[in-house]
Design a protein with these regions (language model features):
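Bacterial lipoprotein signal-peptidase II cleavage site
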Residues: 18-32
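Ligand-binding clefts/hinges and TM-proximal coupling segments of bilobed small-molecule sensing domains
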Residues: 39-43, 170-187, 225-230, 258-288
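Extracytoplasmic small-molecule ligand-binding "clamshell" domains
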Residues: 39-118
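Short helices/loops that flank or line small-molecule/ion binding pockets
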Residues: 87-88, 96-97, 101-114, 128-130, ...
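A ligand-binding cleft/hinge motif common to bilobed small-molecule-binding domains
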Residues: 102, 119-127, 174-177, 200-201, ...
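Short beta-strand->loop
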Residues: 130-137, 187, 224-236, 246, ...
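A bilobed periplasmic-binding-protein/Venus flytrap-type ligand-binding module shared by bacterial periplasmic
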Residues: 141-151, 237-257
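Flexible hinge/capping segments at coil-to-helix
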Residues: 145-163
Length: 288
């Protein structure tokens, strides 16, 4: 999960220089510029990936998608799903932790081959990257201390509250763009896990995170069992996809494999293992 090759680091620096020092929002012009350098050459992406014999997959840690299990090994829905797809395609998965706010820079610098970690499909992202068909549904929800679960039901209730979301995420877009939060005080964090820690410690009042994360992290006996999702208030219905460099032919390869795993029932089997089966949409070859 470390960047090991010097020429890749040089590429990352070059890409960062091209896009400038602000990549805080996928809707920024910097994000658009980040996609440009590799669009013309990405057609041969699959040859590049298969030639290495491995697919370098950019992730962040959050349960139940990618996390370290009790045995000390990486596990989770996305981990198992990506492993199954790579097996079908004849390459090895190589999971690499990234800073979510710099995901497109990492992608275009070829320090990773794809972003596979609960990536919300948006028009802006589709303009900058080649994204597979959707494989999971999601929404943004509020998480608070359990004793405050009934406190934040209206925009008036949220006035003056301290809100945290992951920088560059759909949660951040909700925090900044929804009228519900316009009189709250927003602060970004560099991961969804840190958002929960902010609420747990009392530094923030409300975390805006992926609904699927609550399934894995707020269960009884977990480190966050003292937190609770606010019922009846959710935002930004969305779907997840896997992002490759703009113009990449690897995107279609993976989409075709997703369809196969869905038709075989393997995708649903993996989702059920992590209590995510209700989040799997109907998938077919014409879904893109």
């Amino acid at each position: 999960m470390k960047k090991t090759l010097a020429f890749l680091m040089a590429g990352a620096m070059a890409a960062a220089a091209l896009v400038g020092c602000s990549a805080k929002n996928d809707t920024s012009s910097a994000a658009s510029d980040a996609a440009a350098p590799t669009a013309a050459t990405a057609d041969g992406d699959w040859d590049y990936i298969s030639g290495k014999g491995e697919m370098t997959i950019g992730i962040t840690y959050f349960e139940p998608m990618n996390y370290i299990g009790e045995d000390g090994k990486l596990t989770g829905f996305e981990t198992d799903f990506a492993t199954a797809v790579c097996k079908e395609l004849g390459v090895e998965p190589k999971f690499q932790e990234i800073e979510w706010d710099s995901k497109e820079i990492e992608l275009n610098a070829k320090t990773i081959d794809c972003i596979w970690n609960g990536l919300t499909i948006t028009a802006e992202r589709e303009a900058n990257m080649s994204i597979t068909l959707p494989y999971m549904s999601n929404k943004q929800v509020m998480v608070v201390k359990a004793e405050n679960a009934d406190k934040y039901k209206t925009a008036a209730d949220v006035k003056g509250a301290k809100v945290v979301a992951e920088a560059g995420s759909a949660g951040e877009e909700v925090a900044k763009g929804e009228d519900f939060f316009k009189e709250a005080t927003y602060t970004p964090a560099d991961s969804q896990a840190k958002c929960l820690l902010e609420v747990k410690s009392g530094t923030s009042d409300i975390a805006i995170i992926d609904y699927v994360m609550t399934i894995g992290t707020l269960r009884a006996g977990s480190d966050y069992s003292d937190l609770k999702m606010v019922e009846g208030q959710d935002f930004s219905p969305e779907v997840y996809g896997i992002a490759f460099r703009k113009g990449s032919d690897a995107s279609q390869k993976v989409s075709d494999t997703i369809v196969k795993l869905y038709n075989d029932g393997k995708l649903q089997e993996i989702a059920k293992k992590y209590n995510l089966e209700e989040q799997i949409p109907k998938i077919n070859a014409n879904a893109e």
